Regions:
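Short loop/turn segments that connect beta-strands within beta-propeller blades
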Residues: 1, 62-66, 110-114, 158-162, ...
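Short, conserved, GDST-rich strand-edge loop motifs in beta-rich repeat architectures
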Residues: 29-53, 94-103, 145-147, 187-206
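Blade-terminus and WD-like Trp-Asp/Gly-His loop motifs, strongest in beta-propeller folds
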Residues: 17-27, 81-91, 131-141, 176-185, ...
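Conserved blade-ending motifs and adjacent loop-strand segments that build the rim/top face
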Residues: 123, 167-177, 218-245
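Short coil/turn segments at the loop-to-beta-strand junctions that recur within blades
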Residues: 8-14, 74-79, 122-128, 169-175, ...
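Asp-box/WD-like beta-propeller blade repeats and closely related beta-sheet repeat scaffolds
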Residues: 1-57, 66, 70-73
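Blade-level signature of beta-propeller repeat domains, shared across WD40, Kelch, NHL, RCC1
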Residues: 240-279
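Loop/turn-rich, solvent-exposed surfaces of beta-rich toroidal or solenoidal domains
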Residues: 149-152, 167-222
Length: 279
């Protein structure tokens, strides 16, 4: 039977993805004040919304009682809240907006709202994007790229030591995800990023492939072509983005594409004898 656990209050708008903890007993999410809200139907509006400095709050919701508690609140566009797996006290979130304009994208906060801390200070011309927790909770992995460069870097942050490190170079993938322990990653080849202000400075060639990355070997291989258009469809900016992830047995990859005309889900099996490449 279905039941309503929580309803966003009238004066707020629920934004982005809301993510459960490992036990699926609670969620973290972002709400934006309705008075500041603009429907983000395309990337031009996305850029303009950043400069508005909307009133946002990061909250948690108890999935049993529906009780909500504000963890963090400020007049900065917040997004991408994610519990650290198996550690409910640690929540990651981001400062949303064009990656070359945000002060620092990735942040952590304790679940009680204390100890707000920056994951990484951006280097000159550096953009960081699509951070995610390795499913075992061991690291926060993200994509880093520099203005004027075609390639990108897979990096990771250890929340226990506070150390950032570059893992390996890679082709220009937009979204990464890992297997359970972070030894294998999967990414989607992309083109010039739309979520930066200076698109001219970040122009790159389009890449239509899905890639798997072997972290120990610092090498990668092509899985299949995704051939998505990256287009905004029906006012949804990310419905055509591949966002690949491994199947539970790690033998195939699930992804989205509109290569056949409409956005759809596909599964591509990993090759049995892949050709290993180096960036």
């Amino acid at each position: 039977a279905e039941r309503e656990v929580y309803r966003v209050p009238e004066e707020w708008i629920g934004y982005g993805t809301w993510v459960a903890n490992s036990d699926c007993t609670k969620l973290v999410g972002i709400e934006i004040a309705r008075r500041d809200w603009t429907p983000l139907n395309d990337w031009k509006i996305f850029h303009d919304f950043f400069h508005k400095g909307p009133h946002c709050r990061l909250l948690r919701v108890d999935l049993k009682t529906g009780e909500s508690t504000t963890i963090h609140e400020e007049k900065i566009w917040l997004g991408h809240p994610i519990y650290r797996p198996f550690d409910d006290n640690t929540v990651a979130f981001c400062h949303e907006g064009p990656h070359d304009l945000v002060d620092a994208r990735m942040w952590l906060v304790n679940e009680d709202g204390s100890n707000v801390r920056k994951v990484k200070a951006h280097a000159e011309g550096e953009s960081c994007t699509h951070e995610f927790w390795v499913p075992d909770g061991s690291a926060l992995v993200y994509v880093s790229y520099l203005k004027g460069q075609q390639g990108r870097t897979i990096s990771r942050f250890n929340p226990d030591t506070g150390v950032n490190e570059a893992v390996m170079n890679m082709p220009a993938c937009s979204h990464l995800m890992s297997n359970v322990d972070g030894t294998m990653l999967v990414g989607d080849g992309s083109g010039t990023p739309v979520d930066v202000k200076d698109t001219g400075g970040y122009t790159i060639d389009n890449d239509p492939y899905l890639y798997a990355f072997d972290v120990a070997k610092k090498a990668y291989f092509r899985i299949a072509r995704h051939d998505t258009s990256w287009a905004t469809v029906a006012n949804s900016r990310q419905v055509t983005h591949p966002h690949p992830s491994f199947t539970p047995d790690e033998k195939a990859v699930l992804y989205s594409s509109d290569k056949d005309g409409k956005p759809a889900l596909y599964i591509a099996k990993l090759p049995e004898q892949p050709e290993m490449l180096h960036a």
